[in-house]
Amino acid sequence: MTFQAVQTEDTLAIRPATLNDALSIYELISSNVVAGHLLERSLDEVQQHATRFFAAIASEELVGCGELTQLSSNVAEIRSLVVKNTRRGQGIGTYLLKALIDEALALNIPRLCAFTHSPRPFVQAGFSIVPHPWVSPKIEIDCQTCELFRCCDRYAVVLDLTTFSGAPK
């Protein structure tokens, strides 16, 4: 997918990531862990799952990414959705979110979830804020071993793709 980034002359390409993107993805995620926006991911983990990511590329630079990981046959999670600080506010996150939703639809995944500090873009895309226990596959797989489990300040959001009418424009 190719888009025109808002408030810039750059052409933005959203594409599936490759192993060659892993280091750039890792560096982008790591720069946001320090700010408390994302959970830490190891380079090895990002390399192992690089093909589950979508990459936003502008001027041959990775400026955003997001991962779609299947938690069960019924639920997939959007993880590590992040845009480079200097590129925020240009619609890049919305384009990445659209690509991840489209991929979930293509894979016939009935439900998407995410845990986020910033629920607004998800809600604008049709997600609903829900209590954490409503996303039990995520809790069972990841949350119980997280050091923030008992004091998690992230919002749980879900999107029912069986009734979804369309990805954000």
PLM regions with names:
Residues 12-25:
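A short beta-loop-alpha structural element at the N-terminal edge
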Residues 29-62:
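Active-site rim helix/loop that mediates acceptor-substrate recognition in acyltransferases
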Residues 55, 61-69, 74-82:
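Conserved beta-strand in the GNAT
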Residues 61, 84-95, 107, 124:
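Conserved glycine-rich acetyl-CoA-binding loop
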Residues 89-102, 114:
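Conserved acetyl-CoA-binding loop-helix of GNAT-fold acetyltransferases
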Residues 110, 116-142:
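Conserved active-site alpha-helix within GNAT-family acetyltransferase domains
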Residues 135-169:
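C-terminal "cap" of GNAT-fold acetyltransferases
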